Amino acid sequence: VGADGTALQKPNSAQKEKMIVYKNSIQPSMVSETPAAYEGNLWKRLSQSKFRSSFTLKANDRHYVIEKGMDTVRSHATDFIRDRLAPAEPKNDGKQTPMRGHPVFIGQHATGTCCRSCLEKWHHIPKGRELTETEQKYVVDVIMEWIKRQMQTL
C-alpha cells in the first residue's frame, strides 16, 4: 500500500530491467533512457554546478571532433569507458580521467562520468561493481550528448 492508501503493483519484467539496486533500495535507473530525456533533471543539475559547467570544448577539441567525426569520437568514448570506468575497482579511481587531451575526457568531467564516485553522485550508478553494458552505453550517450551540444555552440 502506498502513502496515499492505494494498492501498489509489483513491477513487470520490463520495469525490473529499468531498475537497479542502490544502497539497499530499488531506485529507477536512468540507464535505459536517452540523455535528452533528462533536460529538466540531469542537464539542469549539471548546469547548476560551478565545477561541471566550467568545462567547455576548446578550439582544438572542436577541430578534433570535426576532423575525426562523431562516430570515431563515440568509439573512443566506448573504449575509454570500458577500460577506465567500467571495472568494479578502476585503477586510480578518482584520478583516471585527464582534465584535457581528448574531447571525451572533457565531456566526462562536464557530465560527472569521470570516476565511479562522480558516477554514483550524479547518475546514481553504484560503485563497487562492474558497469553493465547498458550502463556503459548510457555513460557514452551522456558524454556524446554533451559533446553534440558543445559543437552546436560557438
Where are these regions (language model features)?
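Extreme N-terminal basic, low-complexity initiation segments
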Residues: 2-12
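Polybasic, lysine-rich low-complexity intrinsically disordered segments
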Residues: 10, 16-18, 24
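Core of compact, soluble alpha-helical bundle domains
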Residues: 33-81
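Membrane-interfacial helix-loop segments of redox and metal-homeostasis proteins
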Residues: 58-68, 83-85, 96-97, 101, ...
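Immediate flanking context of iron-sulfur cluster ligation sites
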Residues: 92-111
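Iron-sulfur (Fe-S) cluster-binding segments and ferredoxin-like electron-carrier domains
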Residues: 117-138
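Short Fe-S-cluster ligation motifs
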Residues: 138-154
